[in-house]
Amino acid sequence: SRSSETAIVTLTQGEIEAQGYQRLGLDQAAAARLKGRLRAWDSLAAPLWGGVAQARCVQLGYYCLQLPAMAEQPQTPFASRESGECDVRSVRRHNPLSLPADADGQPTWDNLIADLAAVIEHYRPEVLLTPHPELDPHHDHVASTRAVLEACAQTRWQPQTLLLYANHLHDNDRWPMGPAGMGIALPPAISALPADRLWSPSLDAERQLDKAMALALQHDLQGALPLKKRLRRLIQRLLAGRRWPATGEDEFFRKAVRRHELFWVRQR
């Protein structure tokens, strides 16, 4: 991080789609619990590589792909779809501060908003980095930004600026196109967007490598690709000359490590 006062708040555990962990002899629920624990650990430990201390990292522990349903029924608990758990406190033991949902552990929208409001009041950020609500279609990403804005409506401390980013697009999950280390083109204009300013800080080769190593610390991005994807890449390499970085096989190593970043700047 280029800021000495960065704080990182992770909303969900990341426990679903844990088939790879079933190879360890675990059933679906146990594999999901293990993956959730590992990704929760990553959310607290990996930021240290970028100079963000654990005391400035918070894991809220809500469950993957449940945020949109939570938003529609704010007082109803929504358990994990795969792990069998329904208590967000299971991955909160290393958090640096107490939060409202620590009282009952219920995975509800009301608890999520209260947690986020408490975090905002504690860290008093001037800038919030959150997924772009119009560009990034991932349901949890859209709901995450909605939750952040609802929490801001309840806090005395008011962040002034949103930095918005997109990990996915509605019609193209290969964006940004091209190999790692290259630039990032603006995504296709499929529909009208708010007239936000752009901020595109550059990353030199050393920072790009540091970012790649930060990605490599994430358990979810480790391991070999499935055979089908390996064969597809071999064909693409031979016929289209495509290349993937040596830093990691997951697509994020190609998409996320570029010579500059791209953020949409929205004033509140």
What are the language-model segments listed below?
Residues 1-123, 145-159, 168, 214-217, ...:
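Active-site rim/loop-helix segments in enzyme catalytic domains that contact anionic ligands
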Residues 15-18, 133-141, 172:
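Active-site environment of divalent metal-dependent phosphoester hydrolases
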Residues 30-33, 132-135, 195-204:
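Active-site rim elements
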Residues 60-63, 130-134:
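Short, well-ordered beta-to-alpha junction loops that form the rim of enzyme active sites
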Residues 126-127:
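Structural motif
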Residues 141-144, 148, 174-180:
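Histidine/acidic-residue-rich catalytic or RNA/ligand-binding cores of hydrolases
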Residues 164-175:
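Active-site segments of SGNH/GDSL-like serine hydrolases
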Residues 175-238:
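A conserved mid-domain beta-alpha-beta active-site/ligand-binding segment of alpha/beta enzyme cores
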